[in-house]
Amino acid sequence: MVSYTLGDIKAAELKSRLAMTMKGTVLECDNARAIHFLASTALMREGAPFDADFIVKELRFLNSKGTPYPWDMNYYSRVFDRVVTQNIIAYYAKHHNLNMVAAAQGMLERRRLPKNDHEYTYSPGYSRYANYDEYFGSLDSMTANQLRDYIVFMHEKHDNDVLAQFILQQNKYRNPSYFNDLLGTKLIAEGRFSEALPVLKKVPLSYVNGLGIALIMAHRDYKKPRWFFKQRVKDIYDLGVDEELEKVSLKYNQKITFCEDMSRLEQRYELAKLANNATRPELAMQLAVRYYQASCYGDCWYLTHYDKPCDDSTRAWEKDFAQQAMTYLDVAKKDVKLKQEALYARAYVQLNVTTNGSWYGYDFKEYQQLLK
C-alpha cells in the first residue's frame, strides 16, 4: 500500500499479488486482495488491458463481506467505493463513456444510502440533495441528447458487458417520472420547447407537486418582468419557512404552459418579422421577459434548473436565455412606447448577469458604465 500511495502502481500490484500467496488472518488476506484489486484497476485506468470479468468478481467478493456496520464504518464498502471512484469511474471518464460514469455513480449512491432513506427518492427538487449527490450532478451535467441516450442505456440488457450488467443491477432506479421531468427540463434549458412538451406531459402532476420547487412554482409567474420587482416566496430561502405555503397543490405544470407559451410566441414573432409587422417589438418584449425569468438569473429559474446557487451562470450546453432576452430587448427598444422599459431592462440584465443580483458583487463604477 505504501508503494501505491507513493505512486508506484506497478510495484504495488506486484507486491500485493505476492502478499496474496502468504498466510495470515482473514482480514490480512482480505487486505492483500483489496490492495491488489486497487492497484490492478489503477493500472487499467492508466492503459493496461481492461478486465471486466476480474473487476466484477472482485466487486462481488467485496459485496459478500457483509458487516453490521454502516457504510462509512465498513472496510469492505469503503474499498468498493474507493476502487470504483478512483479507478473504474476514472477509466470510463477517460474514455468519454458518460453512461457508465453516471451508472457507476448511481450505484455508489445506492450503496451509501439506506433503502428506506427519504433522500433515496432521488428527487431533483430537493436542492440539498442536488448539491451533494454525485449521481444527480452527473445527470445534470449531461445535454438533453446525452440524457436520452443514458435512459436507453439503462434499459438495455448488455449481454456482452458483465460490468455494465453488474452496475445496473446495483443501480435499479428507473422512475420514468423522474427521468422524463429531468429530460424535459433540459430540453427547455436548450430552448427546444416543442420537443419538451411531449416529454413533460408524461410526468404526472402529483409528481411535480412533490418536488421541492413546487412551492416556488406555485407562487411565481414567468410573465412578470423581473427588472421591475422580485417575486418573493416565504420558503427557507426567504425569511424562514411558512408552513401554510409549504402545503401547496399545483393546478398545472408550469413547465408545460411555459413551453406552449414560448412556442406560440416565437412562431408569432417569426411571422411578424417576415411581414415587418408592427406587433414585432411587443412580441419581442414578451419573449424577453419570459427568457430572462426562466434563466438561471430570473425568479422562474425552476423552469430550467432544480436549484439556484448564488454564483450560477449559463452552462455551456444550455441556450443563453439572458443573452436571448438582450437580443429581443434590442428589438423592443426600437418602439417608442417600449424604449424606456427596454433600455432599463437591458441595464438590469447586464448588471445581474455580472453579479447574479448579489449585493457583494455590486460595483458602482461598472453599474454607471452599463447605464451609458
Feature-to-residue mapping (PLM):
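Extracytoplasmic/secretory-pathway proteins
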Residues: M1-K372
